[in-house]
Each structure stands twice: as structure tokens, then as C-alpha cells.
Amino acid sequence: MRILGLTGSIGMGKSTTAKLFAEAGVPVYDADAAVHQLYEGEAAPAIEAAFPGTTANGKVDRPKLSARVVHDPAAIKQLEQIVHPMLGASRQKFFADAEAANAPVVVLDIPLLFETGGEKRVDAVVVVSTSPELQRERVLARGTMDEAKLNAIIAKQTPDAEKRKRADFVVDTSHGLEPVRAQIAHILAEVVKMPQRRA
């Protein structure tokens, strides 16, 4: 089984690309969705114990938790120590299920793949990319953040040019879905020929 790491900066089209991998029959592990699931249940008691008042009705109140840890590196580290082992267990279950289903390829959808050293745990890296203009246009069209917040997020992420340089495959999402589907088909044909690389 080959493990593909899928990453890309905000607004590049990573979520759409992940959906198209799933549409092609590839099991996809969504790291963000897995964290949200943990916040909905399993992780809530430990988070409440560490950060009192950040949960309600057995679920993590994400805005409250974010406000509590955002400017406190020690608190962020403490939160990671709670969540990461649970995340690791959910990822292992995903791998076991994929192995049982004889999946030749799986995708790990990890927004901060390079920032967290995740590229060492995969056989090949797929970076989703588009022009900076289209990236801004997409994010600002969502209406969930302004230019200043977008700039702050982009500043924290590995630059797109560096991600592309470190990628085994680059998916360009500038021209609609059909070209992306074609790029995915090419990647799936190529990755099974590649040697296993993960540590």
C-alpha cells in the first residue's frame, strides 16, 4: 500500500482535490475532520481538565479553546500532547481498515504536512497549487475572513513555491475540475510504481 501525503496552502483547492481522490475510490484520511471528531467527544474530558471552561455538553467549544491557547505556546504544546496520541490512534485504524480492504493507495490530507514533518511518514507528497491571485479570490469569496487574517495565515504556512519544490506531484487547480481529475489519474498510475519511502 502506498501512502500519499496531500497538502496545500489555504485557498489552493486541497479539499476539492481530496474529494476527487475519494471519488476515484481512494481512501482519504482528513486530519482536520479527525480533530473535529475528537473535539466532539473523545478528547473533550481531557481538554476540559487541562483548560476548564472550554467545553459545553461534552463537546469542545472551539472558539473558547482557541482564545485560551492561541497566544500561549505552552498551552498549545499541552493541547497537542492531549490530541496527538488520539489522532495517531485514529490514523492507525484508518490504515488498518484500508489494508483490510486491499487499497493500493491511501491519501493523508494534512494541511501542515511539511510544517509537522509529516512528509517522512508518506511515500510521496502531492501539493495542490494555484496562482496567488486565485488563492486570494477564493478565500475572500468565502466571506469568513478579511485580507489581514488571510495574510496572517499565509505567513505561518510554508510558502507555496517551497512546497512545490519539495513535492513529488503538483496538482494545479487553476483550470477547473476535469484537469484535476486527469492529474489525479496520472498520480495514481505513477505512485504504485514508486518504491515505499516512508520511515
From Swiss-Prot:
Reactions catalysed: 3'-dephospho-CoA + ATP = ADP + CoA + H(+)
InterPro entries linked to this entry: Depp_CoAkinase, P-loop_NTPase
Biological process, per Gene Ontology: coenzyme A biosynthetic process
Compartments, as annotated in UniProt: Cytoplasm
Gene3D superfamilies attached to this UniProt entry: P-loop containing nucleotide triphosphate hydrolases
Pathway: Cofactor biosynthesis; coenzyme A biosynthesis; CoA from (R)-pantothenate: step 5/5
GO terms for cellular component: cytoplasm
UniProt xrefs under SUPFAM superfamilies: P-loop containing nucleoside triphosphate hydrolases
Binding site for ATP: 11-16
Organism domain of life: Bacteria
Major location (coarse): cytoplasm
GO function terms (MF aspect): ATP binding; dephospho-CoA kinase activity
Catalytic activity, EC: 2.7.1.24
Domain DPCK: 3-199
Enzyme type, top EC level: transferase
Pfam families assigned: CoaE
Alphabetic keyword roster: ATP-binding, Coenzyme A biosynthesis, Cytoplasm, Kinase, Nucleotide-binding, Transferase
Family label: Belongs to the CoaE family.
Role: Catalyzes the phosphorylation of the 3'-hydroxyl group of dephosphocoenzyme A to form coenzyme A.
Protein name according to UniProt: Dephospho-CoA kinase
Organism in which the protein naturally occurs: Bradyrhizobium diazoefficiens (strain JCM 10833 / BCRC 13528 / IAM 13628 / NBRC 14792 / USDA 110)
Name of the encoding gene: coaE
